[in-house]
Amino acid sequence: MKQYLWAGALALVWSASSPARAEDAYLARARALLARSPVIDGHIDVPEQLKERRDNKLEGFDFTNIPGQQASYNVDLTRLKAGGYGGVFWSVYVPVELGPDEAVRATFDQIDVMRRLIDRYPERMTLAATAAEARAGMRQGKIIGFLGAEGGHSIHNSLGVLRDFYALGVRYMTLTHFANTDWADSATASPAHDGLAPFGREVVHEMNRMGMLVDISHVSAKTMADALDVSVAPVIFSHSGAQAVNHSPRNVPDAILARLPANGVVAMVNFFPGYVSEAVRQWNGAHAAEEARAKSLNPGDTKAAAAALAAWDKANPLPHATVQQVADHIDHIRKIAGIDHIGIGSDYDGIETTPDGLEDPSGVPNLFAELLRRGYSEADCAKIADGNILRALAQAEQVAARLQRERAPGEAVFAAK
């Protein structure tokens, strides 16, 4: 009798632990997969953090393992390697509120500080200029880096500045940020140009000619459509999700997702909870409305307004975004556009909160484990990790080689209305 009871107990223990064992198996597979096909992240904001926290001074800064990491920076070399990273597009972002000349200077400063940071770790990091250089660097076990300029305001309507950025390692430029430029409409501003203005088309032409990827995150749906019409090379969304899953205008409508295959677009999925979780997006809207209400009911009394808002927050706790919800965006993009058009664009170090399980790059294997659990093949996951974005960049380089044989650098000059 005792041996039957013992056998039954073992069966119960095995049954109870088998889901955890299965999850551990998915995670182990994800880690092994990323060791072979490391993640290239389309958008990480380390340069912005270096500006805001250190005024671009690197003396005494240890990027291998940043102390107090959870409370400040998401990213360092230790966590990138733990997450199976092989490469990053380092975002060189400056606020849209800067004056035009100051924005150009500040962007050059962002480029400079990131290049200096990479140079401090030659055994672990390298700046790549091409897809082939990226593959070679990753084979050496290094974190390869490209630069990405976040917002066309950074060039102050100058194709010459755009070319200077390319020469310094910038391999994509986001056409707008949260505000319109003089030549393109943003997703989060009232339209001024009905999409892409004539000079914006010249910007896209010149980016194609150089081999710089056109990034249409942050832009309006009409600007997205216009960029797809104009560009003869693959474009990207460096950090955006699916609008059908989260209704933010920062995400991509299905009508645009359906066009991704024709252009070779890669939509690199963002981790910002407000763009991932519809519940978080709605909470953010309600919180903003409640904050305005508290201020209007307590004019001039900031303490009373803050207390009222704190009471509302306590009664209405912020929902959490999850790894599973990020995977839902990937599922939807795969359904509409196909597996060849998905990547990862976390926005780490540019966001204040993150989905549970994706608190920093070391958690990214959790996302790939979730995809494997949902039935994605390892070949599918390898495309999402780095295959798709390297393919898009290589195709853009091929287009550029042809265009450079056919035409000289663009000489268009912006003319204000």
Please give the residue ranges for each predicted region:
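Positively charged n-region of N-terminal signal peptides that target proteins for export
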Residues: M1-Y4
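Bacterial N-terminal signal peptides
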Residues: A7-A16
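N-terminal hydrophobic targeting/anchoring segments and the immediately downstream early-domain regions
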Residues: R21-D194, H247-K417
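Histidine-centered catalytic micro-motifs
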Residues: V39-V46, V219, F237-G241
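Alpha-helix-loop-beta-strand connector modules within alpha/beta enzyme cores
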Residues: I118, A192-M210, A227-F237, E370
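Distinct, well-ordered alpha-helical segments
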Residues: S158-L162, T223-A233
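Short, contiguous, pocket-lining structural segments
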Residues: A192-F199, D215-S220, V252
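Substrate-binding cleft of carbohydrate-active enzyme catalytic domains
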Residues: V203-I216, K222-D226, I256-A262, H332
